Design a protein with these regions (language model features):
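NTP-dependent nucleotidyl-transfer catalytic core
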Residues: 1-158, 162-166, 172-180, 193
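Catalytic adenosine-cofactor/nucleotide-binding cores of aminoacyl-tRNA synthetases and other
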Residues: 104-107, 185-231
């Protein structure tokens, strides 16, 4: 989700995993969360995310795309690397269509039972946050239908959202070959705390946010235990 103006080293873990698939001949698809950034992922949070405006999101998406192309190589053809946002999917869909075509295939009880929703359940989950989970599922469904995407990769805190997409595809399409998902570990400190935007302690991929010197020193100064966790 484009809720900041730069990706972080946490995003880099998933991107490098996708890059390895690309090296072995797979087509890589990077989905940038435009519409979903307006709401924010409630997973493993004890409070609702702050609202992010559309103008800021468009600026962030532009920055994200430039950073992704640095990882994959700026000369990658669209047939090998597709970078797209998810705003058009939802802008072109009426609320009635969203509820009848998508909502009827999603089990609310399953979403509410997730461990990732526990903190938000206790504080009060908004309808918008619940809808976010359905939007995540629809993202995978759209890529499966129109881009022949068969595997979704995300951080292991996204496992529930990935499974929702897999279930939606199965219920709507009954595919001969099921959609699949895989997760990568989150970057954490030695004490287990997450390194990322939501923790307030990110290491940015933007030179303006984290200078090359600071980026270099972050890796040099890792403890042995943290270096093993990052490997």
């Amino acid at each position: 989700d484009a809720t900041s103006d730069s990706l972080t080293i946490g995003n880099l873990v998933a991107l490098m995993t996708l890059f390895r698939f690309r090296m072995h001949g797979a087509r890589a698809i990077v989905l940038l969360g435009e519409a979903t950034a307006l709401i924010g992922d409630p997973s493993f949070r004890d409070n609702e995310r702050e609202e992010c405006g559309r103008t800021a999101i468009l600026h962030n998406v532009h920055n994200f795309e430039q950073q992704v192309r640095k990882v994959f190589g700026k000369q990658e053809e669209p047939s090998h690397l597709l970078i797209r946002g998810n705003a058009k999917t939802f802008d072109d869909m009426s609320y009635t269509m969203f509820m009848t075509e998508i909502g009827r295939h999603v089990c609310g009880n399953d979403m509410l039972r997730r461990e990732s929703m526990k903190q938000r359940r206790e504080k009060g989950l908004t309808f918008a946050e619940l809808g976010y989970l359905v939007m995540q599922a629809l993202d995978f469904n759209e890529l499966w239908m129109f881009e022949n995407c068969r595997v979704q990769i995300g951080g292991n805190d996204q496992w529930g959202n990935i499974c929702s997409g897999i279930d939606l595809i199965r219920k709507r399409h009954q595919p001969e070959h099921p959609a699949l998902g895989m997760t990568v570990p989150l970057l954490t400190r030695a004490d287990g705390s997450k390194i990322g935007k939501s923790s307030g302690t990110p290491v940015w991929l933007s030179e303006e946010r984290t200078s090359p010197w600071e980026f270099f020193n972050y890796w040099i100064n890792l403890s042995d235990e943290e270096a093993i966790q990052h490997a």
